[in-house]
Amino acid sequence: MQKVSGSGKKTTAFQQRKSDSVYNNNEMNKGTSSISYDPVYFVRDASSFTKTTHERAASVKLKLEHLYKVTVEQTVERNQRRMDFEAKLAQDRGSEERKKRQLNSLGQKESQFLRLRRTKLSLNDFHTVKVIGKGAFGEVRLVQKIDTGKIYAMKTLLKSEMFKKDQLAHVKAERDVLAESDSPWVVSLYYSFQDSQYLYLIMEFLPGGDLMTMLIKYDTFSEDVTRFYIAECILAIEAVHKLGFIHRDIKPDNILIDKTGHIKLSDFGLSMGFHKTHDNAYYQRLFESKINTSTSSTQNSLMVDTISLTMSSKDKIATWKKNRRIMAYSTVGTPDYIAPEIFTQHGYGQECDWWSLGAIMFECLIGWPPFCSENAHETYRKIINWRENLYFPEDLHLSAEAEDLIRKLLTSADQRLGRYGANDIKLHPFFRGVNWDTIREINAPFIPQLKSITDTSYFEEIDTIPNITMNSPPVLQNKIPSDVDQNLAFVGYTYKRFDMMTQKGIL
């Protein structure tokens, strides 16, 4: 649009607006040259924000931190894999053309892995073959991945129970130790994912059952058999410690037998690392107020409730062993293998796992744990006062080396063998003749006889397992976590393992 000015010249609307603006500014400046302006301060008070705003801010902060952490870790891991592969090729006498093809193949696998990482897994990707275990927080199933036919053990955890029982830090630590480990002594984790109600851990299936089943069946082991299993347990515990974790729940139930008869550690639900997300206080701060927990839980979520057990003579030890399996599936668990310093809560380190090993060795040779009693509270009392309660039956004769090793493991933390590392235990005379580098290559004392890849004959039939379901009892409304809380607590739980994703027959 144009208009004619008083001088007869045509001006545009833009030129007119600019002229008016300059005029108005000049007029204003004439009378304001002496006026001073006070600065304006804005005070941001977070307390005035709504709960929803706080939750969203916390969620964004946590997700950004996780995104940055994962991006850096993936880049470092990818570069390290290439460097390791190049170092391996440098020692290969093959042609340069062949090496180049192998490097290109690695690059293709890396690209494929990145695409697969973005693929969301769900329960629909797996077919349940059989339920092989139940617990207070979930269950374990033998499953088959639909697109590949591969067999796994699927551990499911109920999210609401994790909140109620104050298990968030332990859940994260369990996932992390399984994801970080590539040791042959630790159960391999292939995937982890979640939905609105459950967490899922997809792990290797070990068809030989566990050490507890063997102890129930055979009562006791010879010293040679005990030496084999305890030596392998030492290497397994050492592998966990090297990752910077404390297992805290070493017991026969958590020592699994693979198809070759060798052991692997499992169930890191009470493990503790040194990352902030492995500390319950982190989640309490994250949610602003502490989530109510069960009255039976103690600090570190080690629960000790009364269990009706009877053991006043050898004849009644059979009753204890029968109830032993029931305890394994209960919310309470068994305190028989827990170190005294964990109960007293005066601080403890990795040496607490060596106490547990001593208790297992005692049971392998004697037939029952060293402090088993009529109930869990009595066991707790005996462990605290271990000096007055540790004794060896006179009618059972152990070698001097075996008894000495047990006594050096079942002692105070500051005197315990292994407090400076696993090598001190390996050097004990009881293990004279053990080749620590090749022990996994020798024939195990017991090798499972399997009929198929889905053979579960070494697992107890589910009908005989205590009826502990995944359904939670009614809870108060303030104990039910909000969707935002659940999202915050389990950010970063998803995982896929690279080495399995790139093998022939991609998962």
Swiss-Prot record:
Domain (Protein kinase): residue spans on this chain: 126-431
Catalytic activity: L-seryl-[protein] + ATP = O-phospho-L-seryl-[protein] + ADP + H(+); L-threonyl-[protein] + ATP = O-phospho-L-threonyl-[protein] + ADP + H(+)
Name this polypeptide is given: Serine/threonine-protein kinase CBK1
UniProt binding sites for ATP: 132-140, 155
Organism name: Pneumocystis carinii
Residues covered by region (Disordered): 1-30
Entry's EC annotation: 2.7.11.1
Biological role stated in the UniProt entry: Protein kinase that seems to play a role in signaling pathways necessary for cell growth and mating.
Single GO BP term: maintenance of protein location in cell cortex of cell tip
